[in-house]
Design a protein with these regions (language model features):
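Structured catalytic/translocation cores of nucleotide/phosphate-coupled proteins
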Residues: 8, 23-24, 110
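Gly/Pro-biased beta-strand-loop elements
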Residues: 41-164
Length: 167
């Protein structure tokens, strides 16, 4: 279980606590598997508005470096860095996740995770196979952080997407 002090704090209002964007972060390093899976992804050319791209921003709240905050109203995720900075990412928060708030730890991480749609998701958005293998057609995207309360999986994830146009 990964516990490197990462905590998730869902916050309703973070307005006014962030300064101007300093500069876009450099592109993430892609593994050879990432490059192979993304080579022909239908969303490879999706345009994400500049404001929702990854940026390093000033951060003046009290959370410690390593903390992850999700601002559901502004649709941003902040990864707190040392020195009053944070990496800000544009996000979409699913309807189910809006029902939960609190503090959790990252209990597990996965690259190209499989997705097992719940019965509720099947009824609302399906039909899907019982299991969708990791890859460019999987709604969880390339990475997932599994959120735990104590030793219990909350079933909530911070994950990528195969639909960046909805960010």
């Amino acid at each position: 279980m990964v516990k490197r002090g990462l905590a998730l704090l869902l916050v309703g209002l973070l307005g006014g606590c962030m300064q101007a964007t300093l500069a876009p972060s450099s592109n993430a390093s892609l593994t050879s598997r990432d490059r192979q899976l993304l080579a022909h992804a239908r969303y490879a050319q999706a345009t994400i508005p500049e404001t929702y791209r990854r940026h390093i921003v000033d951060y003046t709240r009290k959370e410690q470096p390593g903390t992850i905050l999700v601002d559901t109203n502004s649709k941003y995720l902040y990864y707190v860095l040392p020195g009053g900075k944070a990496i800000r990412y544009g996000v979409t928060v699913g309807e189910e996740a809006l029902a939960w708030s609190g503090i959790a730890t990252v209990g597990k991480t996965a690259e190209w995770p499989d997705w097992i749609p719940t019965a509720e998701i099947q009824a609302r958005l399906g039909p899907y196979p019982k299991r969708v293998a990791g890859g460019p057609d999987n709604p969880l995207g390339a990475r997932a952080l599994y959120l735990y309360e104590g030793n219990k999986d909350t079933l909530y994830r911070i994950h990528g997407t195969n639909q960046p146009e909805y960010i």
